[in-house]
A protein has these predicted regions:
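Conserved PLP-binding catalytic core of the aspartate aminotransferase-like
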Residues: 125, 140-184, 188-190
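Structural signature of PLP-dependent enzymes
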Residues: 88-131, 224
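A short helix->loop->beta-strand "cap" motif at the edges of active sites that frequently abuts
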Residues: 12-16, 38
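Active-site PLP attachment segment
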Residues: 35-80
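The feature captures the short pre-catalytic strand/loop hairpin that immediately precedes
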Residues: 76-92
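Active-site core of PLP-dependent enzymes with the aminotransferase class I/II
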Residues: 1-13, 26-31, 209
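PLP-dependent enzyme catalytic core of the Aspartate aminotransferase-like
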Residues: 171-175, 187-224
């Protein structure tokens, strides 16, 4: 999404902004001080931060976002009280914390910082551009690419439901995600709400050979 334009509108209207950094955390720098309206940034841990599934981060930048815990009780610090503690971190930590997940996410973040988000992004963008060029030569495919995109590429196989295409790609050894990708309004805007798309995601460990393999696999996809 065009964050600059959205932030400008919300700043003028006095509306706080919560930014979804699901596809950008770990590959794009976000200057949180640049946007006065930015109140929080949320991101999953299992994507470009290389952490385990089931982890994530909600970065609250000020008191405009008063996050409430999903579950309460069992904090271990005020067991004699019937109410949830009102101080941090206890207010947000009910039950047994996901220590293995937190440790894994911390290790993933250390990896990203050691390699550099810019270096990871450059590697992924190179592979995305190569794959997009190869797929655009196939008239049966509609490729959704943009110069500023990160390591994610969406493709629609004309006349083939996204789920069918994904299943055939899986048979060829290519793991993709099919559907609306938690963004139905984006698909409505793109005109793919009814069919969905196939989404391919690259990482720092992806190789040019894998991109070539994916391009070849798309040639085999057909309507069942």
């Amino acid at each position: 999404a065009p964050l600059d334009e959205i932030a400008e509108l919300l700043t003028a209207a006095g509306v706080p902004l919560i930014s979804d950094a699901s596809q950008s955390a770990g590959v794009a720098e976000i200057d949180v001080k640049r946007y006065p309206c930015l109140a929080a940034v949320c991101m999953p841990g299992h994507k470009a931060l290389y952490g385990p599934m089931g982890t994530g981060i909600l970065l609250a930048l000020d008191d405009r976002i008063a996050a409430k815990p999903l579950l309460t009780g069992g904090t271990g610090s005020l067991s004699e009280e019937l109410r949830q503690p009102d101080f941090l971190p206890d207010a947000q930590e009910s039950g047994t914390p996901n220590v293995p997940g937190i440790a894994g996410l911390a290790a993933g973040i250390r990896f990203v910082r050691s390699v550099g988000a810019a270096n990871i992004a450059a590697h992924e963008r190179k592979l995305v551009r190569e794959l997009a060029r190869a797929l655009e030569a196939n008239e049966r495919l509609e490729v959704f690419s943009h110069p500023s995109q990160t390591g994610v590429l969406s493709v629609r196989v004309k006349g083939v439901p996204a789920e069918q295409a994904a299943a055939q790609l899986a048979d060829a050894g290519i793991a993709v995600r099919a559907g609306l990708h938690c963004a139905p309004l984006a698909h409505r805007t793109a005109g793919t709400e009814e069919t969905g798309t196939v989404r391919l995601s690259f990482s720092f460990y992806s190789t040019p050979g894998q991109a070539e393999q994916a391009a070849e696999a798309f040639k085999l996809v057909k309507k069942l």
